[in-house]
Amino acid sequence: MILLITTSKSLLTLDTETEKLSVIHTAMGLYYGITFSETEIFVAARNNDNPFDYLGKPDEQGVILVFNAQLQLTRKITAPFPLRDMHQIMFFDNKLWITCSADNMVVIYDGNEWQQWYPSPKLADRNSDINHFNSLWVKNNELHLLAHNLGREPSVIYRYNYPDKKLIETIALGNQAHNIWTLDNPQEYFSCDSDNGKVISSTGKKVALGGFPRGVVITEAHYYIGTSDVAERAERDQVSSKIVQFNNDWHQIKAFTITGHGQLLDIKAPGINDIAQAIHKGIKLTD
C-alpha cells in the first residue's frame, strides 16, 4: 500500500511493503492536509519561507497543490483572501473544505465560489486563533469539526447536521487533539490526544503511542497512526517521526521511521477504503 505523507518540509510517499520513502514535493512547507476526489489529490501547503510551525503568520499566503494519479503537480489553487495556518482539508459534496486555524474559520470552495464559515457564534472569535479548528470528518451526512483549543481547555468535537450546519451536539475529547473517526460503534468517537501521546475514544479506550500523534488511516485490516518527537514549534522541522501500524485489535505490527523531514502532519491512502477520510476510497494512484 502507498501512503501519502505530509511533513514540515515535504510531501512524501511510503510503500508499506518495501518501506521505500520517496519525496514528491518540497520547498513549500509546512505541508499539512491531504484529501482527494475521484480524479485529483489536494495538498495544503503553507508556502512559508521556512517550514517552522507558526501559529499563522500575518503575511502567510497558503496554497492548495493539486496532483494527478501519477503524483504530478498539475495546478495550484489560491484564494482571494489569505489561507493562514491551514490544517486538515477535506473533499466532500464536490467541495474543498479547508481548516484555517489562525482565523478560526473553515473555507469552502466549490470550484467557482469561496465561502468563509466561522463556526464560533461569537463575532469576537473571528480572525483570531481561539478554537484552533484543525480536523474535519463526515459520516451519515453529518459534519464533524474538531476544536484543538490550544491547551486552554479540553478539545471538542462539534457535530453538525448537513447541509444546514445546525449544531447537534459537542463532545469533549482529549487535549490538543487531532483527527476524528469511529469504528464499529458509531457513538464511540476516536481522536489523537496529541498532548498525552495517545489515541483515545469517547468511551474511555486509550492506546499509548508516545510522542505527538496526528495523521490517521483506518482500513478494514489495519490502522496507521502518525506520531512525531515532541518539540517546541520553532524546532518541529528538525524532529523525527514515524507511522505505527496496528491490526484492528490495536496490537502493534510495525513502525515506519521517517527522518530528515520534520514533524509528520497528515497521512492518507488514495484508492484504499479509509473510514477516517470523507471520501473513503477516491482516486487510485498509477505509475
Q: What residues fall within each predicted segment?
A:
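Conserved beta-strand positions in repeat-built beta-propeller and related beta-rich domains
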Residues: 4-9, 43-58, 98-103, 145-152, ...
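Short loop/turn segments that connect beta-strands within beta-propeller blades
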Residues: 16-19, 68-72, 109-113, 161-165, ...
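Surface loop/turn motifs at the tips and blade-to-blade linkers of beta-strand repeat domains
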Residues: 23-28, 77-82, 117-129, 169-175, ...
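Beta-propeller blade signature
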Residues: 57-70, 156-162, 238-249
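Asp-box/WD-like beta-propeller blade repeats and closely related beta-sheet repeat scaffolds
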Residues: 73-92, 99-107, 114-132
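Blade-level signature of beta-propeller repeat domains, shared across WD40, Kelch, NHL, RCC1
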Residues: 238-287
